[in-house]
UniProtKB/Swiss-Prot annotation:
It is an enzyme of class 2 (transferase). This is Ornithine carbamoyltransferase, catabolic. Pathway: Amino-acid degradation; L-arginine degradation via ADI pathway; carbamoyl phosphate from L-arginine: step 2/2. NCBIfam families: orni_carb_tr (TIGR00658), PRK01713.1 (NF002470). It is found in: Cytoplasm. Its EC number is 2.1.3.3. The gene is arcB. Its main location: cytoplasm. Carbamoyl phosphate binds at residues 57-60, 84, 108, 135-138, 274-275, 321. Transmembrane segments: none annotated. The keyword Transferase applies. GO terms for biological process: arginine biosynthetic process via ornithine; arginine catabolic process to ornithine; citrulline biosynthetic process.
Length: 336
């Protein structure tokens, strides 16, 4: 290994240097190639990893499980219905129990302070699978995907995020781009921009890396000349459908549609989404929204014609969750 990341937490990427991030990206690329060519070697035999999910997931759970199994590790999936976490036992006590049984712990849930408390008391590496504030494993997958779809070096890559930028995706896309010297544009109503303290921290990173940061309320200005257009759902998991009315009114100008993609003015532009996406009315939630807002039957944050077009690389992005998570596990836990 190029340098030592052994037993290190991954909580937000705030404390990872650009060199750390590039190393994880390069290791992800190498592990992906090894899997595709059938030359992968197992470095995590006899390792045990606990997966705590207070929020449900498809991609994060599958990515951690397959990554661990590929490398010879064992996993235990823990959901709110199969544990005492938060009911009869605090997260602090849970951390001190699991840390004696497992080599690492993944947490996907709500507040950032919970995953940080886990890391404080577990005594083993803790990985943030998603909190309200940050989504670091997704960021590694996103940058790996962007690298795969352009010949440009990282500092020449330009991307825009459209939508609610106060959430984990807005925060994290701003952070990773600032760390790596990229050109990052955030387009959202000003009330939905990332918090001022987070923007200030990212601007400081940008000064060091040469990154360009733009926050604007004009979506077409944001996407002009970009290589990639990102978005995310407009409300978080668990929010009632009734809460969508005001959010739809605020964010409809930031819907990723054909007009927005063409406004990039780049024939090689690609669309990215961390998924799941409401791109039609075939899901239960999509159908409920379409019943109340018929103009959204063909997509909410992204339209069906964009999602089902060659612009969309969200499924490659989803696959790369597994390769980048594998890199995190190997770099942290492997005895090499």
């Amino acid at each position: 290994m190029a340098f030592n990341m052994h037993n290190r937490n991954l909580l937000s990427l705030m404390h990872h240097s650009p060199r750390d991030v590039r190393y994880l990206l390069d290791l992800s690329r190498d592990l992906k190639r090894a899997k595709y060519t059938g030359t992968e070697q197992q470095h995590l035999k006899r390792k045990n990893i606990a997966l705590i999910f207070e929020k449900t997931s498809t991609r994060t759970r599958c990515a951690f499980e397959v990554a661990a199994y590929d490398q010879g590790a064992n996993v235990t999936y823990i959901d709110p219905n199969s544990s005492q976490i938060g009911h009869k036992e605090s997260m602090k006590d849970t951390a001190r129990v699991l840390g004696r049984m497992y080599d690492a712990i993944e947490y996907r849930g709500f507040k950032q302070e919970i995953v940080e408390e886990l890391a404080t008391y577990a005594g083993v590496p803790v990985f943030n699978g998603l909190t309200a504030e940050y989504h670091p494993t997704q960021m590694l997958a996103d940058v790996l995907t962007m690298r795969e779809h352009t010949d440009k070096p990282l500092h020449d890559i330009t991307y825009a995020y459209l939508g609610d930028a106060r959430n984990n995706m807005g925060n994290s896309l701003l952070l990773i781009g600032a760390k790596l010297g990229m050109d990052v544009r955030i387009a959202a109503p000003k009330a939905l921009w990332p918090h001022d303290d987070h923007v200030a921290a990212c601007k400081k990173f940008a000064e060091e890396s040469g990154a360009r940061i733009t926050l604007t309320e004009d979506p077409k200005e944001a996407v002009k000349g970009v290589d990639f257009v990102h978005t995310d759902v407009w409300v978080s998991m668990g929010e009632p459908v009734e809460a969508w009315g005001e959010r739809i009114k605020e964010l409809l100008p930031y819907q990723v549609n054909v007009e927005i993609m063409k406004a990039a003015g780049n024939p090689r532009v690609k669309f990215m989404h961390c998924l799941p996406a409401f791109h039609n009315s075939e899901t239960k939630v999509g159908k409920q929204i379409a019943e109340q807002y018929p103009n959204l039957k063909n997509g909410i944050e992204v339209t069906e014609d964009v999602f089902e077009s060659p612009w969309n690389i969200a499924f490659e992005q989803a696959e790369n969750r597994m390769h980048t998570i594998k890199a995190i596990l190997v770099s942290t836990l492997a005895d090499i």
